[in-house]
UniProtKB/Swiss-Prot annotation:
This is Integration host factor subunit alpha. Keywords: DNA recombination, DNA-binding, Transcription, Transcription regulation, Translation regulation. Transmembrane segments: none annotated. Belongs to the bacterial histone-like protein family. GO terms for molecular function: DNA binding; structural constituent of chromatin. InterPro entries: Hist_DNA-bd, Histone-like_DNA-bd_CS, IHF-like_DNA-bd_dom_sf, IHF_alpha. This protein is one of the two subunits of integration host factor, a specific DNA-binding protein that functions in genetic recombination as well as in transcriptional and translational control. Heterodimer of an alpha and a beta chain. The keyword Transcription regulation applies. GO terms for cellular component: cytosol. Pfam families: Bac_DNA_binding (PF00216).
Length: 106
């Protein structure tokens, strides 16, 4: 596994290189896409990106947890969590990339 993290600036630069928009336009395009995705998720809508995966928001109910230091029971409040499900194509791409790094051995 790699420790490399791709940042917004790097994504914006990749859009600039690939699409040929100006750097400012590339950054604006990336921000618009991310704003649209996050806005839809905030409303509770699912976001499906073909050949990539789907994002959805799931509600988790209240439950009882335990403080690991004291063993005391603690209520955990209900909340919404973000869920990402990769597409089969993305899973295959990732697994093929891992196999190539290991020299083709599975």
């Amino acid at each position: 596994m790699t420790d490399k993290t791709i940042t917004r600036a790097q994504l914006s630069e990749a859009v600039y290189q690939e699409v040929g928009l100006s750097r400012n336009e590339s950054a604006d395009l990336l921000e618009a896409v991310l704003d649209e995705i996050s806005g839809a998720l905030a409303k509770g809508d699912a976001v499906k990106i073909s050949s990539f995966g789907s994002f959805s928001v799931r509600s988790k109910g209240q439950r009882i947890g335990r403080n690991p230091k004291t063993g005391e029971e603690v209520p955990i409040t209900p909340r919404r969590v973000l869920v990402f499900r990769p597409s089969q194509l993305l899973k295959k791409k990732i697994n093929d990339g891992m196999a190539a790094k290991r020299g083709g051995a599975k």
